[in-house]
Design a protein with these regions (language model features):
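Catalytic alpha/large subunits of respiratory electron-transfer oxidoreductases
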Residues: 1-214
Length: 214
């Protein structure tokens, strides 16, 4: 095959690194203990779906009917992406953050969720550790600074956080968009914390949807 001929010409037998997948696996595993997420088919039960850094309609087309089925039952679909993709045009709302500002946006959302009393403390106490340190960091976030970093106004950050925490079941769907950049693992770690802090994992259709295999 062409790729083998290319590596033969370089004198190499294989690429001794991973281009993307391990970034997401390690980020999710840092939070969940394993790199797996919710079953994508369960998105049909979601009432909030954040498509974060994924042009689902083009690169994950077989999942789109599931998302449309959820919309038919009242789900709101939000695309979080620096690019105005085909999926963003079809979504209910497009949150167009600056490239590389994902962690800042998540921390801003966590600040709002904590500030407004939307943290599921019972879930955190029963199923997690270190959450108090996380929320202490989130409380120090300045939303005006977050708006400057992300290019998203404070009202939109508050809307996104409140919608995810209260319009349930709520899920985040990520694919390779966050992996093909510097600090992608940290972005995946941050996103994995969102459904834990709100207790989204309690419900079918809630959680983080990324990989279904290890």
């Amino acid at each position: 095959v062409m790729s083998q001929r290319f590596f033969d010409a370089m004198g190499a037998t294989r690429v001794h690194r991973h281009l993307c997948g391990v970034t997401a696996w390690l980020g999710a595993a840092d939070v969940h203990g394993v790199p797996l997420g919710m079953d994508p088919e369960d998105l049909r039960h979601s009432r909030t779906i954040l498509l974060w850094g994924t042009n689902t309609l083009v690169t994950n087309r077989h999942l789109w009917p599931t998302i449309e089925a959820a919309r038919a039952e009242g789900a709101v679909v939000v695309v979080v992406d620096p690019v105005r993709t085909t999926t963003a045009e079809r979504a209910d709302r497009h949150v167009q953050l600056r490239p590389g500002s994902d962690v800042a946006l998540v921390l801003g959302m966590l600040h709002v969720i904590d500030r407004d009393g939307l943290v599921d403390r019972a879930f955190l106490e029963d199923h997690t550790s270190g959450w108090d340190e996380l929320l202490a960091d989130a409380r120090r976030v300045d939303l005006d600074a977050t708006a400057t970093i992300t290019g998203i106004d404070v009202a939109t950050i508050e809307w996104l956080a409140t919608t995810f925490a209260t319009r349930r079941p709520a899920a985040v769907r990520v694919l390779v968009g966050l992996e093909h950049r510097q600090h992608g693992q940290e972005a995946h770690r941050a996103l994995a914390m969102l459904p834990a802090v709100t207790g989204a994992w309690r419900e079918r259709g809630g959680g983080l949807c990324r990989s279904t295999q290890q």
